[in-house]
């Protein structure tokens, strides 16, 4: 019985953690989902963005007390503008998606929403982490050795 409880706790901790992509695994997945060159944004820039926003973690969340919004998933997509979490005051939900969908191990919905984000005038500059860590830098290291 004790072993069953311990196994249950281990499985629960794995479930809560979500998927943490390896760098090259993410690069291949993003390429397959059509992000390489989308709106002129290189695959390396997308991988750099994911590194600095979530450390490649699909379950990453970050609460923003200023506007009571939360950032979700591998790209840290914000509930004030892009998704619906049922809690953020004045939310727009421009991606027309539940924020929980952005926390799935299958990142297809997150990629679709990220494509919507970059169609806005700010483009990829909407992400502070991209501006701080990727913009005007050599980001080729993020796809180096990945065969993409």
Swiss-Prot record:
GO terms for biological process: defense response to Gram-negative bacterium; defense response to Gram-positive bacterium; killing of cells of another organism. PROSITE patterns: GLYCOSYL_HYDROL_F22_1, GLYCOSYL_HYDROL_F22_2. Coiled coil: none annotated. Disulfide bonds join 24-146, 48-134, 83-99, 95-113. It is an enzyme of class 3 (hydrolase). Residues 19-148 form the C-type lysozyme domain. It catalyses: Hydrolysis of (1->4)-beta-linkages between N-acetylmuramic acid and N-acetyl-D-glucosamine residues in a peptidoglycan and between N-acetyl-D-glucosamine residues in chitodextrins. The active site is at 53, 71. It comes from the Eukaryota. SMART domains: LYZ1. The keyword Disulfide bond applies. One of its GO terms (molecular function) is lysozyme activity. SUPFAM superfamilies: Lysozyme-like. InterPro entries: Glyco_hydro_22, Glyco_hydro_22_CS, Glyco_hydro_22_lys, Lysozyme-like_dom_sf. Keywords: Antimicrobial, Bacteriolytic enzyme, Disulfide bond, Glycosidase, Hydrolase, Signal. It holds the Pfam family Lys. Lysozyme C is capable of both hydrolysis and transglycosylation; it also shows a slight esterase activity. It acts rapidly on both peptide-substituted and unsubstituted peptidoglycan, and slowly on chitin oligosaccharides. Lysozymes have primarily a bacteriolytic function; those in tissues and body fluids are associated with the monocyte-macrophage system and enhance the activity of immunoagents. Monomer. Belongs to the glycosyl hydrolase 22 family. This is Lysozyme C.
């Amino acid at each position: 019985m004790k072993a069953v409880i311990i196994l249950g706790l281990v499985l629960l901790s794995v479930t809560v953690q979500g998927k943490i992509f390896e760098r090259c695994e993410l690069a291949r997945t993003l390429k397959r989902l059509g992000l390489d060159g989308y709106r002129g944004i290189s695959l390396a820039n997308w991988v750099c963005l994911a590194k600095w926003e979530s450390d490649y973690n699909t379950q990453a969340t970050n609460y923003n007390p200023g506007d009571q919004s939360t950032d979700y998933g591998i790209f840290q997509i914000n509930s004030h503008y892009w998704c619906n979490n049922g809690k953020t005051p004045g939310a727009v939900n421009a991606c027309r998606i539940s924020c929980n969908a952005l926390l799935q191990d299958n990142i297809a919905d997150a990629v679709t929403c990220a494509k919507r984000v970059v169609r806005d005038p700010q483009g990829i500059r909407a992400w502070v982490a991209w501006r701080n860590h990727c913009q005007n830098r050599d980001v080729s290291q993020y796809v180096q050795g990945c065969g993409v």
